[in-house]
Structures are given as C-alpha cells and as structure tokens.
Regions:
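Conserved small/polar residues in nucleotide/adenosyl-binding loops
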Residues: 163-168
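Short secondary-structure boundary/capping elements
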Residues: 14, 45, 71, 152-155
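Extended, polar beta-sheet/loop recognition surfaces of beta-rich domains
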Residues: 171
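Active-site-adjacent loop/helix segments that line or gate small-molecule/cofactor pockets in enzymes
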Residues: 1-21, 56, 78
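Hydrophobic alpha-helical segments, chiefly the membrane-spanning helices
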Residues: 174-175
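Glycine-rich loop-to-alpha-helix module at the N-terminal edge of alpha/beta enzyme cores
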Residues: 29-113
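Short, acidic, Ser/Thr-enriched surface-loop or helix-capping motifs
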Residues: 24-25
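PLP-dependent aspartate aminotransferase-fold enzymes
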Residues: 77-162
C-alpha cells in the first residue's frame, strides 16, 4: 500500500524537531514556520509538554466523552475563567476540519438555514461540509454539495458587508 497523494511533496524528509527547528535525514536544519496541520505552538519536544504528555499517556491516553472525565471538566473550568466566558459550553474535538464542520452545523441548527459565505482561496479541512466551503473544486465531490456556498474575495470588507446585509435572511453563517 502507498500513501494517498494529497499534496505535491517537498523533497525533504523531516525526522526530528527541537524548539522552533526541524531537521531532515541529512542533518539539515530548518526554521519551522509551518502553520498547517497539528501545529505545535510551544515548539518541538518542549520539555514541559513532553513531561505532561508522557505522564498522561502513562495514565490514560484517550477515552470516550460518554463518561465523566475530570481532566475535561477541569480544562473547561480553566478556559472559562481565563477567557471570561465561564457561562459558555466547551465542545472538545479533534481537528480544525471537525471544528468547522460542527460550527456550520451549530449555525444551521440555530438559524434553520443552509447558505454560507466563505472566502476565495480558503481551506477548511477535508470533512464533507468543510470541503464544501473550501474554494478548491478539485477536492469537492458531488456528495459534498449539500448546501449553497457563496465565495467572496478575502479582505474585501465592503463586499462582505454588502453581501451579508443584502442576503442576511438567507444565510446560515459567514465562515
């Protein structure tokens, strides 16, 4: 079996990381400015992060949210206090695509609508609804067309305000 061809690959085999650098299999060092998948904003192999992850992995690596998990409750409490939104609910998920997918569903539940504004050249993930609001026809399959999407130019605030005010009665949300 081979890996699915998702992106054209750079000819770099990254084998380790430390701090803000990654290293390839030839020993070359690169400043890691990647801002995509599963970004580790504390840097690679940060000692505190490694210590806490190792401790947790030695206790329980994962379990369903269908049972009480005091760590999740503690996290929600801390985030609520730190953000000033302690009367909100925290929905823990796995990825940005899943976050986008569920934000679209929550907006649709709330508005009862299914038309969304997204922005040109955007990428929101590979789940079905996230693909539908991604401005890349190459990855949108017929099954993804479950709601209408209008693409507007990124950073054209006037066009966005005009469209959203004119179409407010039709819109589920603006991504």
């Amino acid at each position: 079996m081979k890996l699915f061809d998702v992106y054209p690959l750079f000819d770099i085999n990254v084998v380790r990381g430390k701090g803000c650098h990654v290293y390839d299999d030839k020993g070359n060092e690169y400043l890691d400015l990647y801002g995509g998948h599963a970004v580790i904003s504390v840097g690679h192999t940060h000692p505190y992060y490694v210590e806490k992850l190792t401790k947790q992995l030695n206790q329980l690596s994962f379990y369903s949210n269908s049972v009480i998990n005091t760590l999740q409750i503690e996290l929600a409490d801390k985030l609520g206090r730190a953000s000033g939104y302690d009367d909100y609910s925290l929905f823990l998920i796995n990825s940005g695509a899943e976050a986008n997918e569920n934000a679209l569903k929550l907006a649709s539940f709330h508005t009862g609508k299914k038309k969304v504004v997204s922005f040109a050249h955007s990428f929101h993930g590979r789940t079905s609804a996230a693909v539908n609001i991604t401005d890349n026809p190459k990855i949108i399959a017929p099954i993804n067309h479950t709601f209408e999407v209008v693409y507007l130019a990124l950073n054209d605030i006037d066009a966005c305000l005009l469209y959203t005010s004119d179409a407010a009665d039709e819109l589920d949300g603006v991504d």
